[in-house]
């Protein structure tokens, strides 16, 4: 491991036990359209992990629900989802041994690259007292994981 200078983590299911949290939040947000459509959005989320909520809600509104259906629009879905997820991320389990792994990798930069909302991730990790571990930064949507990684590599923040 002596040649490794950075470790890049995903958030959901890696650092935080939060995969089910987001599935439940997507379901809850879509429930005003009915259980059938809420289940369809939750299933779409599961099948398309790592894609931003912006894209998932746009897909839901444009491709899943029928034209003229009554229910919350894009901004309301986004706001409800953000509130629900943030509340649950503040309470979910943190990966066991994270602190001891950080201690064993002192000389390496830690980064988070996630499909989650970047501002929300920074706020949650700050409020949970975990932000200091990620000295390389905490990155998320609206940019995709691929775009974030390309930028970090091109700016020599991650060396391969």
What are these regions (language model features)?
Residues 2-11, 15-96:
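N-terminal helical cap/lid subdomain that shapes the substrate entry/recognition surface
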Residues 6, 145-160:
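Conserved Lys-Pro-Asp/Glu-containing loop-to-beta segment of HAD-superfamily phosphomonoesterases
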Residues 21, 52, 119-120, 143-147:
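Short alpha-helical
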Residues 26, 57, 121-125, 134, ...:
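Hydrophobic packing residues within well-ordered alpha-helices of enzyme cores
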Residues 30, 61, 125, 129, ...:
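Conserved hydrophobic residues forming the short capping helix/wall of the S-adenosyl-L-methionine
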Residues 44-45, 74-75, 130-145:
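A short, structured active-site edge motif that brings together acidic residues
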Residues 83-112, 118, 122, 146-147:
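Short, acidic loop-to-helix structural element flanking the phosphoryl-transfer center
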Residues 107-112, 135-136, 160:
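Short active-site oxyanion
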